[in-house]
UniProtKB/Swiss-Prot annotation:
It is found in: Plastid, Chloroplast. Disruption phenotype: Delayed age-dependent and darkness-induced senescence. Increased resistance to oxidative stress. Involved in modulation of redox homeostasis to regulate leaf senescence mediated by age and stress factors during plant development. Its function is dependent of EIN2, a central factor of ethylene signaling. PANTHER family: SENESCENCE-ASSOCIATED PROTEIN AAF, CHLOROLPLASTIC (PTHR36725:SF1). Plants overexpressing AAF exhibit increased root growth, elevated level of cellular reactive oxygen species (ROS), enhanced sensitivity to oxidative stress, and early leaf senescence induced by continuous darkness and by age-dependent signaling. Belongs to the ATA15/OSA15 family. This is Senescence-associated protein AAF, chloroplastic. Expressed in leaves. Expressed in 7-day-old seedlings, roots, rosette leaves, cauline leaves and flower buds. GO terms for cellular component: chloroplast. Keywords: Chloroplast, Plastid, Transit peptide. InterPro entries: AAF-like. GO terms for biological process: cellular response to oxidative stress; leaf senescence; reactive oxygen species metabolic process; vegetative to reproductive phase transition of meristem. The gene is AAF.
């Protein structure tokens, strides 16, 4: 009979069996020297009887490794180191030295360390395989996500193209519907016009439009007559004032000097030649009023004469003058706007132009015609430079009293303001 020794690893599906005679002998020796066997005084015969039982004896070590002893027949009886005699004979068991027990312990510890090392190596292999599986799974998930994003992008592109096609199709449909409505409206309007013409209402509309045009022409003629009347009244007042001054023998005049040089900012006297020219212009305008429905402002010479007269009479801020300047500055005729720009550019100062004249110049400076805009801009810059005062300049307002009868001796009293 012999002992078969096997190791049982906890939580391990594999039971490793070893049939080794020397190992069986060591286990048996350890059992013989067990303290319990020594205290009870067990004999070799009792040990034999104990070994012949079919129960399992378990020894648990401190390293969680169990050793199971099974009783059974030995496959190789020649390798047994124990000899069991027959019944009635004494059983002889040799004593082992202490060196054998220490060697047994060393071998046991070495085998246990090898087992632990092998187990750790297997655990590392399993861990490495698990990490590799996780890495492969992560790569697979990333690939799945990438393919999902690509599918979403392709789906978005398809949806965008579909929406674009739908919008274009709807726009074409709306354009087609609008064209149909336009054709229907044109046909209905044509039918209504034909019906209106057949009923005689269109002729009434034409008469009404002609009446409104004549009414507008009469209003323009009335405005022109009032304008001419105002200018005529101003000329008469100017001539009366000149006659009064000639009777008294003195004329007072305000002048402005800059650095000792007189500036012609203020209007002076109107000469007899200018008055006669204005009277001829009035007569021509009056004859034109009898033939036409208003003053012909498209004549550049006539317009320049009117504006120059208003400047000389210091009447640029009047109601009729302001309406004339506004109408001529926004006229569609290029020659009219150009003549107005030239006439306003001939003004001696901003003082004589007034708000109406400067407003007309600013509108002409923004004209679409480059020549008109350049002329108006130059006039504005020239007028602004007259009032620029640099360091060291001096401006003086002078009141000059003159006697027109004295040609040789001119006595003037200058009062500085």
């Amino acid at each position: 009979m012999a002992l078969n020794v096997s190791k049982v690893v906890p939580n391990s599906p594999i039971l490793v069996k070893s049939v080794n005679a020397s190992r069986s002998r060591r286990v048996l020796l350890a059992y013989v020297h067990h303290p319990l066997a020594a205290n009870k005084g067990s004999s070799i015969e009792e040990l034999k009887q104990g070994l012949c039982c079919t129960k399992t004896v378990t020894f648990v070590s401190s390293r969680r490794c169990s050793t199971l002893c099974f009783v059974g027949k030995s496959q190789d009886t020649e390798t047994n180191s124990q000899v069991v005699q027959k019944e009635g004979e004494k059983q002889v068991m040799p004593r082992r030295k202490s060196s054998n027990s220490s060697q047994l312990l060393v071998e046991y510890v070495s085998n246990d360390a090898k087992f632990v090392n092998e187990r750790a190596r297997n655990d590392f292999v399993l861990l490495s395989r698990g990490i590799m599986r996780l890495d492969a799974r992560a790569r697979q998930d990333v690939a799945i996500l990438g393919s999902g994003f690509l599918k979403l992008d392709a789906r978005a592109r398809e949806d965008t193209e579909k929406i674009d096609r739908d919008v274009k199709r709807k726009a074409e449909r709306l354009h087609h519907i609008a064209t149909i409505f336009k054709n229907i409206a044109e046909s209905k309007l044509k039918n209504a016009a034909d019906k209106h013409w057949s009923d005689g209402a269109l002729e009434a509309d034409l008469r009404r439009a002609d009446f409104r045009a004549k009414q507008r022409a009469m209003e323009d003629a009335l405005m022109a007559l009032e304008f001419i009347k105002n200018i005529h009244d101003m000329m008469v007042n100017k001539m009366v004032d000149s006659l009064v001054t000639s009777e008294t023998g003195t004329t007072d005049r305000i002048s402005l000097e800059k650095n000792g040089i007189a500036l012609g900012f203020f209007p002076g006297e109107v000469s007899s030649d200018r008055i006669s020219a204005i009277e001829e212009a009035y007569k021509s305008m009056a004859s034109a009023l009898s033939e036409a429905d208003g003053i012909d402002y498209t004549d550049p010479e006539e317009l320049e004469l009117l504006v120059t007269t208003l400047i000389d009479l210091d009447a640029m801020d009047g109601k009729s003058s302001a309406s004339l300047l506004a109408e001529c500055s926004s006229s569609p005729d290029v020659n009219t706007r150009k003549a107005l720009a030239n006439a306003l550019a001939a003004a001696p100062s901003m003082w004589t132009l007034g708000n109406a004249g400067m407003g007309a110049l600013q509108r002409l400076a923004e004209d679409s015609n480059p020549a008109i805009a350049a002329a108006a801009s130059r006039a504005i810059n020239a007028l602004k430079k007259q009032w620029e005062v640099e360091e060291g300049d001096s401006l003086r307002f002078m009141m000059n009293f003159e006697r027109p009868n004295d040609d040789d001796d001119v006595d003037s009293d200058l009062d500085e303001i």
